[in-house]
Amino acid sequence: LPALSQADRVEQRQWMKDWLARRFGVSATGLWLTERVWEPGLPEDLVAAGVSYALVDDRHFLVTGFERHQLHRPWRTESGGAALSLLPIDERLRYLIPFRPPQELADYLRTLQAQELPMAVLADDGEKFGGWPGTAEWVWGRGWLDRFLETLETLAADGVMRLVTPSQALASVTPGGLAYLPT
C-alpha cells in the first residue's frame, strides 16, 4: 500500500472489501499490513477507505522506543485528522508458530498471563503451515498441528487465553495511547 498513490490505496482497499463481502458476507473494518510495511501517512488513507484498525509488525513500535511489554495492547495513531487503531503483531508468536513445540507457546502465553499483559496478536503467512520447505512434514506429518490445537483448547479451558477477533480485542482491551510510527 505505501507504494500506491492515495487514490489507489483507497481503491485497492475497496476492491478487497467488496470481494470479502461477496465471498464471506462480511464487511471488513480492519486489515493486516504485512512484512514491516508502514508509512506515517497511511492512517488518513486507510480511514478514508473504511478501515478502523490495522495489524502491524511490532518492529515499528520497537524502533520508536517502545518496550516489548507495552505491545500487548492496542494503540492509536493518526494522520490528516484521521485516527486508526493499531494492533502490534507479537514477533515471538511468529517464531513459535509453527516452528517450535506447542508447549513453548503455552509457556509463553502463561508468562504473559502472569505479567497481566492483556493481549497477544498473531497474523502470519499461511505458507508456514506446509508451503515452506520442511514445514509440511513438521506441521502435518509429525503432528504439530494436532498438538497445537490441543494446546489451544487446554489454554482456553484453563483461562489462560481467549481467541478473539481484532474487533473484540479492541472492544475489551484498553488502548495504550497514541503511537506515531516511522517509515
Regions found by a protein language model. Give the residues of each.
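Short, solvent-exposed turn/loop segments enriched in Gly/Ser/Thr/Pro and often Arg
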Residues: 30-39, 167-170
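Active-site and substrate-binding clefts of carbohydrate-active enzymes
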Residues: 70-84, 88-92, 96, 103-183
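Residues at the N-termini of beta-strands
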Residues: 30, 53, 119-121
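Distinct, well-ordered alpha-helical segments
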Residues: 39-47
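Acidic, His- and aromatic-enriched active-site or binding-groove loops in soluble protein domains
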Residues: 10-22, 26, 47-82, 149
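Conserved beta-strand positions
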Residues: 33, 55-56, 124
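Metal-dependent polysaccharide deacetylase catalytic core of the NodB/CE4 family, i.e.
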Residues: 1-35, 82-96, 117
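Flexible loop residues that form catalytic
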Residues: 36, 59, 127
